[in-house]
């Protein structure tokens, strides 16, 4: 599944990198997603990834998030409800990352 509206931005806020993704994250763009996460994580011992505007996330994206969580303190911003929030629970990402919900 590919969405032409996939966008990725990285910035530093309060000494910690923040990566914001929108649209679908899947095999077509997970390379860019993973590279951005790795570069951001190299800048700090913690990283925040805002997934609140992500509409779809496949297992390759989950794997990229687990890879970052293995070496860096990871915080994820997600909608209060929906498929991305459900995916965090099913995959176990909610046990290795701090999850912040947004309405």
What are the residue ranges of the model-derived segments?
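STAS-like cytosolic regulatory interaction modules
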Residues: 1-103
């Amino acid at each position: 599944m590919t969405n032409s509206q996939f966008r990725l931005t990285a910035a530093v806020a309060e000494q910690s990198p923040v990566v914001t993704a929108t649209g679908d994250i899947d095999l077509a763009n997970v390379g860019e997603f993973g590279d951005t996460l790795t570069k951001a994580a190299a800048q700090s011992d913690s990283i925040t990834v805002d997934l609140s505007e992500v509409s779809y996330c496949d297992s390759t994206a989950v794997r990229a998030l687990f890879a970052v969580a293995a070496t860096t303190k990871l915080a994820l911003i997600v909608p209060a409800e929906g498929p991305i929030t459900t995916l965090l629970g099913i995959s176990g990402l909610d046990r290795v990352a701090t999850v912040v919900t947004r309405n």
